[in-house]
C-alpha cells in the first residue's frame, strides 16, 4: 500500500500577501498552579504573522507548548519562557507573541467581628506579550465593594433632624427618651441608598517582578475602599459593615481617587488604569469613573 504524504496547507504561500497582527486561539482550557492551588483558566494564545505571504501559523505548536505550565507555578518567568517558545517555533513567521490567562481567584475572607469566614471569588486576567523583544505583564482584577451615597446620607440626616424637632418640640428633652427614640423606626425615618459596586484595576508590572501579586493587589484595593463585600456574617458583623459604610461614604469619584492614591504607592507597578462602577439603586443607570497613571492609551469608559 502506498503511503501518501499528509498535506500541509498552512505551509502554502498566499497570493494576497498581508501581514496579520495577531493569529491564534481563544478560550483554551488549562489548569494553572497559583499560590499552591489549581485554578481552571481560559487561555488566549497567539503570535503575529509578519510573513504576509505565509498562509498561516502552526496553531498546534502553540497549543502543545501550553502543557509546560500544567505542573509549575504560574510566574512571569514561566510565562516569558513559554512566549519565547512560541517565537522559536515560528521563526521567520512571527515577531511578537501573546498570552492571556483568565480565571477566578478564591480567597477565604474572615468576618468583621465574629469568627466566621467564607470564600470570595475574584475575576483575574493576566495579559502578557513579547513585542520588539520586550516582555510585558499586565495584571487585572475585579473587586466588589459597597458604596453609600454621601448626598443621600446628608438628606437622610436632615430628615432625621426634622423628625427629631417634630417629636420633641413641646417637651423637656431627657437622655433616656432620646436614646429610645433613636432606636425606633419612628426616629430613623430615612436611610441613605447604597449599592454593590465594582473596581476594575489593571496594573503593568515591573520587568523584574518574579511573582504575580494578585492577592496583594486585591488586599490593597479592598483596604483603600474600606467596604469590601462580606461572606458569612452574624448580626455583629452586619452592624460593623453598616459602620464601615457610614464612615466611608463615596461617590464614584471618591472611590476612583482613593484607588488612584493607593495604587501609586505600589512599588512593583510601573503603570495602571482603573474603572469604578456604582450600580445605582436610586437610578436605572450606573455611575462610573476612570483614572490612569503612566498608561499608553487614554483610559476610555
Swiss-Prot record:
Please give one Gene Ontology molecular function term for this protein.
GTP cyclohydrolase I activity
Protein name per its UniProtKB record: GTP cyclohydrolase FolE2
Q: Into which EC class is this enzyme placed?
A: hydrolase
EC?
A: 3.5.4.16
Q: Which pathway?
A: Cofactor biosynthesis; 7,8-dihydroneopterin triphosphate biosynthesis; 7,8-dihydroneopterin triphosphate from GTP: step 1/1
What role does this protein play?
Answer: Converts GTP to 7,8-dihydroneopterin triphosphate.
> What does it catalyze?
GTP + H2O = 7,8-dihydroneopterin 3'-triphosphate + formate + H(+)
The alphabetical list of record keywords is:
Hydrolase
What is the source species?
Pseudomonas putida (strain GB-1)
